Amino acid sequence: VVFNSNTFQNYLTSKVTEVLSEQFKTKITINHIRYYPFTGFALEQVYWGDQKNDTLFYVEDLKFNFGGFNSLESKLTLNDVVLEGAYCKMVTYPDHTFNLDVLFNILDPNDTIPDTLSPPFKLYFNRVACHNTRFRLIDSTRVFEPEGFDGFNQDYNNIELLARDFWIIKDSLHFDLKKLSCLERSGLELKQLAGVATICPQAMLFDELNMQTANSNIRNQFHMIYNGWGEMANFNYKVQLKGNLHNSTFGMKDLHYFAPLLREMKLDESFTISGEGKGTVNNLRLKNMNIKFGSKSVFKGSGSVKGLPSVNDMFLDIQSDDAETNANDIEHLVKMELPNEMDRLGQMGFKGRFTGFYTDFVAYGNLKTALGNGQSDLNMKLGDSLTIPSYSGNLTLNDFDIGQLINQPLVGKTSFSASVKGKGFNLKDIETSLESNIAYVEANGYRYKNTRILGDFKHKMFAGKLDMNDENAEVHFDGTIDLNKDIPLYKFKANIAYADLKALHFDTSNLVFSTKMDINF
């Protein structure tokens, strides 16, 4: 009866707020405390201020049951805690003070003479639920970004949370998170977060993780290590990440909130990911990666990614143990139409090293295509438009069906090594200088061997020199071949020292000839 009287409840409210305000050296108010027999306490309009007289924490309704106090363990138990309409704001002020210190300085004051005999105070909740809650993390020393996710101005609304076995020990939290959902200011929606969590001023650990957004589903383990809460405001550069993912799905649409340029580029592919990663967002190291996307694209390997979240500054150093893709998957990934020649390469594979930016990189390793295999040491520059790439370096092809690539039925396979410098892959766009040693090339049903080419190919026209020392043909060529017409135009000087026309499939009779020619037709 006494507990239910308004006089006692008003006295209790006044006394609790007085004690807490004195203990934490800040303004704490509770509009009313109600006690319900067998169901517990209800606190209304609880306000907790910080050292700047701004809001640290506020809750419209807070309900709980008193579970008891164990003096030997310094453990207070509260059961079935429910918060309705809560608001929490963590702020780094312009003078670099952090408002949450008003709480941690009391919970863990670092006394000069610590009491090593007394166990730390522990607060235990068997169940915690939050409804219609808001959380903000602000660094007032920084300039805020107007759009996208801003680590210096994080604002989470519509928070719904359910946790069990919730411990607060000094300045650390540990709990079994059953459900967390929220909507961030940028538009990023967290549909579900579950796992075993530990949160303290130095780390945020999530094990048995299951995180779902509209486009992603991250599973297994994710840890964040930092030197104080203030570093969360500089998340991309200060917070150390460690993840171990298994059969997770990651959608690039979620990256749009962190790198708006990706939205402009309309990059929206989804990836299935397994592997390990550690480092900051700005400097990630990856290993044992297994990434799949599109219909048949896969990457297995390790490496590092620097420069995120800026896509333009993203620098890749990747070791590919096995990578496969095709023109259709690439077109869907980068939202550009590739030349038909790329589609004829079929399923392409690469095993080697990839370093550089996504628009300017070096690929060194072994190539595999449906038309033949090879080795590359090439620098590719895709440019801002991603339409006509430029390249330079060395390329070797083995038993490669170049006739099928360029859609010329009279041309067959070839093996060659070449130094190239130019741009474009489409026949109408290509501008390339090359120096090539051709082990063989098939033409008109004959395999020509031992050929060297030095020249330029531009505007569907080749200009250069060819020296052939085949057993059935010795030819020295200097001139041009123009492929702009249905019937090629030739302008060259040629010294045919020896040519067996029957062996070369130009005649059925045993005709061998040699000549010098000056051709223009």
Which stretches of residues belong to each language-model region?
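N-terminal type II signal-anchor transmembrane helix
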Residues: 1-24, 87
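Flexible beta-edge/linker motif
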Residues: 5, 32-101, 106-141, 157-178, ...
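Amphipathic hydrophobic-ligand
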Residues: 23, 52-66, 142-161, 187-196, ...
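Outer-envelope beta-barrel architecture signal
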Residues: 55, 77-79, 126, 171-173, ...
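Tryptophan-anchored aromatic micro-motifs
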Residues: 125-133, 434-436, 494-496
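Transmembrane beta-strand segments that form the barrel wall of outer-membrane beta-barrel proteins
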Residues: 176-180, 203-210, 283-291, 359-368, ...
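Outer-membrane beta-barrel translocator/channel fold
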Residues: 248-252, 323-331, 404-406
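Sequence/structural signature of outer-membrane beta-barrel proteins
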Residues: 400-404, 441-443, 499-503
